[in-house]
Structure formats: C-alpha cells, structure tokens
C-alpha cells in the first residue's frame, strides 16, 4: 500500500502525518508533540496501552524515514486515540473534544462532514 504524507496543524502543533494501510501513523517523537507532553510520559502510556487494550503487532510498524539508517517505530490511529484518552494536557483535552465530536456525529447522523473541504 502506498505511503502518503499529510500535514496536521492546529493552533499549537504542526505534524507531518504518515497515511498507510487506511490509517494514520505517528512516531513516538510525534505523539508527544501532538499532546504537548514529555516523551517519557507518552512512552509509559504506550506501554500501558499495549499491556491493557491493544495488540502491539498489529498497531506498531517499523518504517524507514528520510536521512536515517535506523527503522523507526510508528504507531497507528488506535494507539494515538488510546494515548489521547489517557494523557493530561491542554492538547489532550482538545484532542478528546475533537474525537468525542466525531464519534457523536457518527452516532447521531451516521456520518461526519469535513467542513474544511466544503
């Protein structure tokens, strides 16, 4: 499957997000930027997510990035959402409100409209 890069940007953060296999993928370095938390805090949440709710093999991919000889861990949207509901930060609150709105729209309307694309 083709790997695409999209830009995610809000008031506080701008990230290059990898899209592959019908999901988004972020590195362990990008997730702390998304939620404005320390890498150690995010690492602990990821560890707990894999111990308590998600399978590591299907939610983690090692991928090559530009200008690096090493493979880098990328975590899919399921991990990002699980961490987002655990992390305590202003960006975490923004993320949870956004995720709740998306879920609510799906439950009530059966679909979500991307207002930016209209």
What is the predicted role of each segment?
Residues 28:
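Helix-turn-helix DNA-binding elements, focusing on the entry/boundary residues of the two helices
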Residues 53-68:
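Short Lys/Arg-enriched helix C-cap and helix-to-coil transition segments
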Residues 1-25, 34, 39, 64-118:
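Positively charged, aromatic-accented nucleic-acid-binding surfaces
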């Amino acid at each position: 499957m083709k790997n695409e890069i999209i830009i995610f940007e809000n008031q506080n953060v701008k990230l290059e997000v990898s899209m592959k296999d019908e999901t988004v993928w972020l590195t362990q370095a990008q997730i702390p930027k998304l939620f404005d938390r320390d890498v150690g805090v995010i690492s602990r949440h990821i560890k707990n997510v894999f111990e308590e709710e998600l399978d590591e093999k299907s939610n983690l991919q090692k991928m090559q990035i530009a200008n690096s000889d090493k493979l880098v861990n990328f975590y899919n949207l399921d991990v990002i959402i699980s961490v987002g509901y655990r992390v305590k930060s202003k960006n975490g609150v923004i993320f949870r409100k956004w995720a709740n709105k998306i879920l609510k729209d799906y439950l009530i309307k059966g679909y979500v409209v991307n207002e930016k694309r209209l």
